Regions:
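Residue-level recognition of alpha-helical structural elements
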Residues: 135, 151-155, 172, 195, ...
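Short acidic (Asp/Glu) and glycine-rich catalytic loops that position anionic groups and cofactors
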Residues: 138, 159, 184-187, 212-216
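Charged/polar positions within long, soluble alpha-helices
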Residues: 171, 208-219, 241-249
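Charged, amphipathic alpha-helical oligomerization/scaffolding segments
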Residues: 138, 145, 202-205, 209-212, ...
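Charged, non-catalytic interaction/linker regions at domain boundaries
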Residues: 1-154, 161, 227-229, 238-290
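Residue-level detector of well-ordered alpha-helical segments, enriched
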Residues: 138, 155-159, 175, 179, ...
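Flexible secondary-structure boundary motifs
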Residues: 161-197
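Histidine-centered, metal-coordinating catalytic motifs and their short helical/loop contexts
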Residues: 196-224
Length: 290
């Protein structure tokens, strides 16, 4: 019976392309199992951010061990005619280019992956207290839940919540302005007013759609919600990837970092970006009056 059970377990795992091996430090069996499950999910959330929502919506931890996803449907039309369909699909995501792994070969990508590994140390060792790693993994969780979420309305809400968890530090007033300025400072590609303002406008738009959704002024099936999902996904992913790189290994390992420290860091970054933009603006030449 034991051999048969082991054989069935092995057959189950053969249905999956990736297997997580998690080592939990200093815990009993029950806590270790729960911690390992959370850590595997945290790693999946990181993969969602690395790969992007478009190629990772079907990724999950565990689930049914199905070799393929077979579905069928019948429809009777008004004239009595019968139409039908059968579809076959794999359990994982498809559509990657052959060289998709090359996206992660650059220096910035390698730094991000290494820093995500540092953040995940918090997930497998409950004794660690690293506030910035915890904050990052929380934000990644909101992003991952948004990717896997079937409801478009819930997706829009969760993507913006990922933004908030990453850049909010207990502030209570003018939240949309604060989030938009910090996201723009993190994600700015070039030091121009246009680029900064574009990021801020996009964040405010995603924030407005989220607010209208949660306060009931728009339907979760409204067309505007799809705009919220698109913006939220792009903004959250860019913010998280840049935060991982800029916080760095030292920040992710810091056990004494506080919300106040992070707020000062964000505010300093916003001021620095504004100063760089100001310095890059050509000054108008002036002539003395005759």
């Amino acid at each position: 019976m034991t051999r048969r059970t082991i054989s069935q377990a092995i057959e189950y795992f053969r249905n999956f392309g990736w297997i997580a091996k998690v080592t939990v430090i200093g815990c009993d069996e029950q806590i270790s199992e729960a911690t390992a499950a959370r850590a595997a999910l945290a790693a999946l959330n990181c993969l969602h951010v690395l790969i992007g929502a478009g190629h990772s919506t079907k990724m999950q931890v565990g689930g049914p061990g199905l070799a393929n996803d077979r579905r069928a449907g019948f429809t009777v039309k008004a004239d009595g005619a019968l139409s039908y369909m059968v579809s076959y699909g794999g359990q994982g995501n498809v559509g990657f280019d052959d060289n998709w792994m090359d996206l992660f070969s650059g220096a910035d990508a390698q730094e991000i992956i290494a820093n995500l590994g540092i953040a995940l140390e918090q997930a497998v060792n409950p004794a660690l207290h690293r506030p910035l790693s915890e904050r990052l993994l929380d934000a990644m969780q909101w992003y991952g839940e948004a990717v896997r979420e079937p409801s478009q309305g819930a997706k829009a809400v969760k993507y913006v919540t990922a933004l908030e968890r990453m850049v909010m530090t207990d502030e209570k007033d003018d939240i949309a302005s604060l989030v938009s300025s910090r996201v723009a400072a993190l994600c700015l590609e070039e030091p121009t007013v246009h680029c900064r303002d574009r990021w801020q406008v996009d964040v405010r738009r995603a924030y407005d759609i989220r607010s209208r959704l949660v306060h009931g002024s728009v339907s979760p099936t409204s067309e505007i919600v799809f705009e919220g999902v698109r913006l939220g996904s792009q903004l959250a992913r860019s913010t998280l990837l840049n935060a991982v790189r800029l916080i760095g290994a030292k920040g992710l390992r810091d056990e004494a970092a506080t919300n106040r420290d992070l707020a000062r860091w964000f505010d300093g970054m916003v001021r620095h970006v504004d100063e760089v933009i100001l310095q890059s603006i050509p000054r108008a030449s002036t002539m003395p009056f005759a």
